[in-house]
Every structure is written in structure tokens, then in C-alpha cells.
Amino acid sequence: VEGERIKEMMIQRKNMKYRLVFQGIIVGLVTGVVIVLNRILINKFSLLFNNFYSWGNKDLLKAILVIGILATIGIIVGIMVKQEGMISGSGIPQVKGRVINKLKMNWSRILIYKFIGGFLALSAGLSVGREGPSVQIGASIGEGVGEKNYKNMPVKKEFLITAGASAGLSAAFNSPLSGIIFALEEIHRNFSPLVLLTVMPAAITADFVTKRFLGIEPALTVGAMDALPLSYYWILIILGILTGIMGVIFSKGIYLFQDLYSKFKNIPQEVKIMIPFVLTAIIGLTAPMLLGGGHELILHLALEEKSILFLTIIYIVKFLLLLICFGSGVPGGIFLPMLLLGAIIGAIVGSFSIDVFGINSSYIINFIALGMAGYFASVVKAPITGIVLIMEMTGSFNHLLSLSVVVIISYVTSELLRNEPIYEVLLERLLKRVGLTKEESDSKKTILEFCIEMGSIGEGKFISEVHWPKGCLLVSIKRGEKEIIPTGNVKLIGGDYIVVLVNVDRRCFIIEEINKLTLV
């Protein structure tokens, strides 16, 4: 009977590819429409809030009214976070936790609350980004589609969650390739063909929808750049080291402010979230240039050269504003603010190089873009995504070499300083705070797929030599286009995909154990 069940599941797995492609398109279509609506509303209401701040700085009474209204909005958002804790922060750690089945979430509730909460925070001008919320909104839509089609097949549902996350980032940035790579490299941590089949149509469809309504330009672009001459590449070593170090400080700052907020247990959540709204009101009344996640500032840096002192002050202020906002738990991400800080570091190095080494001032844009990639690699530890994202922003592959140099040096610097990927750490902290959810205890089976990476413990071992975790059965090995029957004398080689049948109730444990075997 067990053999028949395995055979039936393998047949379903082969036929499932076409369904996943179609459902990936559906997820991308819905996510694209929702994110387009979100972006349009944020753009419209951001202008209203900016005008409101301009009106409020005319006299003291008006200013007090502005602060009072922002405080009220902060309390409303705080109540929403209190009612649905999973909408706090970026949302990317929550999606990662859901994909590995360590968190359970009410997708429809999160979709509504995150949309409204993120919209209010971003429209008001808080120093957070829309990319993280877009990823969580997309993942919620993916889970909703999966709930309708794969209620009793958790792995298939998680493919669609990953597809939704990819579509969300694609729609937020108008960068489909970045969305695909980010979902595979950061969310799913697996370049499985089945995942790719689901993620690609979702990201491309979401990008098509976004471009149809909002134009074909990337949401964040630094404009055309000339290729940096090889004679200047030694400066990239300095930039890589600096972005690596500053990225580590960024991560530590995020954790520090989360801890500071959590120490005040007697202060209600809505009051904590009110704090950044009040601070944003004061910033809007006095220095509106500092509002928002950083999109306008990045464009401003690319258009006009600034002094090193000015850039340093902007960096410190925006860094502190982000820490205060994100630490409170407000629904908003760190993705765009992180890119802004990297852009400022790049601008500082570029300005210094222009002043001291006499390089052409036109290359300041190169340093801004390279700074973003290096900072991203140091903080997120997803170097491929960092490179691809900046290439999509610049619309050119001519900068692959310079991007790779900065990203690798920044990544290695971050590794030497023992900096962990920020979304992994935020997930661990979230799990400690809420406690692990119990997995369903039943006898249901599901199929998982893992890639044997080159240099992993499993590479070069015979199947009979591997200590497979209890509750799993190796049913197939995919080597290129061939499918191999897994007997004890078959040797695993790098690039193999192993297909494993597991008990649903031990799924999370088995994933962790097999990842130790397959990942480097």
C-alpha cells in the first residue's frame, strides 16, 4: 500500500508542474494588481502628507495639530499591530518562517492589515521601505491561492508562497529578475526546478502588470553609467571593506533598538508605534527632505554632488530614524533604507576620490550604485540578489565586474566580522518571542526536493553511507535530465536533486537535518 502511495505521489508530482506554472501566473497577476494599487495610494497620500507638513510649519498651533494627527494615526497602526503581530516590521522574516513551516499565519488577515498599516506608515513618511511589506503581501496572496488548491499538500502551498514573495518584490521594484533571485536565494534557500517554475511566471506577470500601469522604468533607477576604468578598481577594495563594516554596524543597530523597545514591557504596543509617527511629524515640519524610506534621496544623490560632511550627517540621521521606526515594530521594511545608506557610503567614497585622487566626477553615480550593492551584500548576505538588483536599476550588464568586486569584498568583510544574515537573525528573534508553533501531528506524507551542493557533506557519499533522519524515505535522484533509482551503491554528486518522501509531522525537523547534509 505504501508503495502505491509513493507511486501515486510521484505521478502527481510530474503532472503538477503545469498547474504550478498556471497558478504562479495567477499569484503574479493578483499580487501585481494589489501592489500597483498600494504604490498609487502611497504616492497620492505622500503628496497630501507633504502638503500637510508644509501647512503645519506656518505657526505653532498648526504644528501641534499635525503632531496630534500623526500621533493618532500611530495609535491606530499600533492597535492593528497589537491585533495581528505578524504584520510588524518588514514581513520578510515572517515569510521565511512560514516557508519552513515554523510559523502559522492567517493570510487574509495579514493581507488586509499589512496593506493598510504599511500604507499609513509609508504615506506619513516614516523611514521604512515598501519592499518588505510588498513581499509579505505577495506571500499572503500566494498562500491564499495555495489554500484553495493545495490545502492538504503543504509543500505545494509553500511554492506559491515563495512565488508570491517573488512577485511582491518584482512589483515593488519593477525588477523581475531580482524578485526571482531574491525568492530563491533568500526566501526558499533552494534553487529547485519546481520552485523556479512557480516563481518565474509569478514575478514576470507581476512585473508586466506593474509596467502596464506605472511605466517600464525600474522603481528605483540611478540612470545610465559609464563603465568604471580598471585603473580605479583599487578604490573598490576600500568601498567593499567600508560597506562591509558599516553593514555589520547596521545589523547590530537594528537588534539593539529592538532590544531597547522590548525592555519597556509596561508601555503598550500602540504607544511604542506612536513614537516614530510623532518623530516623523516633527521631521516633516522641520526637515521634509529626510522623510520616507530614501527613494527621493537616492535620486537626489545621483543628480547632485554633495559635500562629505553633508553626506555623513544625512547618513547618521537617516540611520537613527530607521532604527527608531523599525525597532518599534511599525509595518515597514529595511530594504530601501538599507540601499539608501549604502548609496550614501558610496557617495562619500566617490566624493573623497574626486577631491583627493582627481577621478572624473561623472563616476559618482557608479560609486552610489556600487555602495548599494556592497551594503546589501553585507547585511542580507544575498550577494547574487545584490548584483542583479543593481544591474536592473542601471539597465546594463557592463558593470558586472565592478559590482562583483565590491559585493565579494563586502561579503567577505561581513563574514570575517561574523555577521549573520539579517533576515535569518530577525526570524530567530521572532521565533523566540512568539514561540514555535506545533506542527500538525498526523500520518500524512509529502514530497520534498533538495539540491546536493558542491562541497557539502553529502557530496561524494554513497546513499548507504548517509544517516537519513527518521521519518523520511529517499524515492528518487534527479541528475540532469535523468531520474535515478536510489539504491545503496549510488554515489551522490554535486548538482543532484534528491526527492524525499517525509511524514508531515516531522517535516520541519527533516528539512533542518537534510539541509545539514546538502548545503555548504
Please give the residue ranges for each predicted region.
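A short, polar/charged loop/turn motif at coil->beta-strand junctions and beta-hairpin connectors
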Residues: 89, 116, 444, 468-471
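Alpha-helical transmembrane segments and immediately membrane-proximal extracytoplasmic
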Residues: 1-435, 454, 479-481, 495, ...
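Short, solvent-exposed coil/turn segments
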Residues: 95, 443-445, 485
